[in-house]
Amino acid sequence: MQSLISFAHSRLSWGILALSALALESAALYFQHIMKLDPCVMCIYQRVAVFGLLGAGLFGFMAPANRVIRALGALLWGISAAWGLKLALELVDMQNNPNPFSTCSFLPEFPSWLQLHEWLPSVFMPTGMCTDIPWEFAGVTMGEWMIVAFSVYLLAWLAFIVPMLKKSA
């Protein structure tokens, strides 16, 4: 348990969180801009959740020895992973059970003080439809891969939450 506590209090653990989220964001932008796969509004919301994971990793990386910083990073990590998983599950449900009367919106519904799609449209403007499945790998859709990714983040958070919040030795 002590080695898990030491790892949870290290820059390495928070760096892995940040770098893995950065890799996911990079892949999303590659799919969008290089492969020309249009992201839907649910994809954009998941992208925001991944940015939350990136932010949590960077936040914890700044001062991993500080218990308050770790707690705030852990809070952002848990919220982002759970919210992302919820969104990925909803997207896969929309894709597997399309309903012409229940579609996703064309524009994201960000708060008025956080209009990401207007500030950075190349990253946050949805241009695709939620029911489209433009890409699969090993017979698994992108939405299903995101369920896997967010589940891993959530399971890692569950494994690390107690060691993260323990006092440093």
Swiss-Prot record:
It comes from the Bacteria. It is found in: Cell inner membrane. The keyword Chaperone applies. GO terms for cellular component: plasma membrane. One of its GO terms (molecular function) is protein-disulfide reductase activity. Coiled coil: none annotated. It is a multi-pass membrane protein. Residues 1-13, 65-71, 164-169 are cytoplasmic. Residues 31-48, 90-144 are periplasmic. InterPro entries: DiS_bond_form_DsbB/BdbC, Disulphide_bond_form_DsbB, DsbB, DsbB-like_sf. Disulfide bonds join C40-C43, C104-C130. GO terms for biological process: protein folding. The chain crosses the membrane at residues 14-30, 49-64, 72-89, 145-163. Pfam families: DsbB. Keywords: Cell inner membrane, Cell membrane, Chaperone, Disulfide bond, Electron transport, Membrane, Oxidoreductase, Redox-active center, Transmembrane, Transmembrane helix, Transport. NCBIfam families: PRK01749.1 (NF002485). Belongs to the DsbB family. Required for disulfide bond formation in some periplasmic proteins. Acts by oxidizing the DsbA protein. This is Disulfide bond formation protein B.
